[in-house]
A protein has these predicted regions:
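PLD/PLD-like phosphodiesterase catalytic module centered on the HKD motif
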Residues: 1-244, 274
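Walker A/P-loop
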Residues: 61, 243-267, 272
């Protein structure tokens, strides 16, 4: 690394962590990355900028949707033309990532896509990290933003952009962690996960649509009423209790009736403890 680059990095660290009044080159300064419409700031703008400047990139996020990758596709296709390699790791966590979005990424010749199987690994996976390397410098965005439209453009998201040499401890630990996840036996290549994941995704999608469409049943609408046999039992039960008896026997043809009768054996009592078993 040149002395000039090292000096600019030190100045950037000073501005970010010691004295905000010190002038520094923005390219070497750690930063808070968020969506702020009033100031015209968007997470996606920072990611696009870093993608266009890097020599290689790695991304690890829990969720990827079409709304998230669509505005990035032009940039990613430009990187494809320039043969800038990228690795993207996502998950089947909550079956939220959209198969269409994953297929779009797979179609890029410069991008290798993997999915971490949280079910087989028996652990959650909620990382949101974007690693960009140019020459000997890493610029890493870590925080709360998945690759979804809302997360990259309008949600309240908190991310930190780290700038480090490749020998920097934090950068080394983050890159090491990424490679450990990427090389894990639970990280599956596209051809090994896509069809199975797509089937599960479509099933769950239909279930969600049905759940949204069907109204919640009203307890008033479906209020249970005793049938004639049960009414007779309740009447006789009251007589037995009023006579001071504490035992009775009901023989019913079906278990359902027994359950309903049991639920209605205390009519008129304000407390269950006042009735007998």
């Amino acid at each position: 690394m040149s002395n000039t680059a090292l000096t600019q990095l030190q100045e950037g660290l000073t501005t970010a962590y010691i004295d905000g009044t010190v002038a520094a080159n923005l390219a070497y300064k750690p930063a808070f990355v968020s969506n702020n419409p009033e100031e015209g700031k968007k997470v996606i703008s920072v990611i696009e900028d870093e993608l266009m400047k890097c020599d290689q990139f790695q991304i690890s996020v829990a969720f990827i949707t079409m709304g998230g990758i669509t505005p990035l596709l032009q940039t990613l296709k430009e990187l494809e033309k320039r043969q800038i390699p990228g690795q993207i790791l996502t998950t089947n966590y909550l079956n939220f990532s959209e198969p269409r979005a994953l297929k779009k990424l797979q179609e890029l010749s410069n991008v290798t896509l993997k999915m971490y199987d949280v079910d087989r690994a028996d652990q959650g996976f909620h990382t949101k990290g974007y690693i960009f390397k140019k020459e000997e410098i890493y610029r890493i965005i870590i925080g709360s933003s998945n690759i979804t439209s809302a997360a990259l453009t309008k949600n309240k998201e908190w991310n930190t952009k780290i700038v480090s040499t490749e020998q920097g401890e934090i950068a080394m630990e983050i890159v090491k962690e990424f490679h450990q996840l990427w090389d894990s036996k639970y990280a599956l290549f596209y051809d090994d996960f896509y069809e199975n994941y797509k089937q599960k995704y479509e099933i769950i999608k239909k279930q969600r649509e049905i759940a949204k469409r069907d109204e919640i049943a009203s307890t008033e609408k479906y209020k249970l009423e005793p049938n004639s046999m049960q009414v007779g039992f309740i009447t006789n039960l009251r007589r037995i209790v009023d006579a001071g008896e504490n035992r009775a026997l009901l023989i019913s043809a079906t278990g359902e009736r027994g359950i309903f009768v049991t639920g209605g054996r205390n009519p008129g009592f304000t407390r269950v403890s006042e009735a007998w078993s």
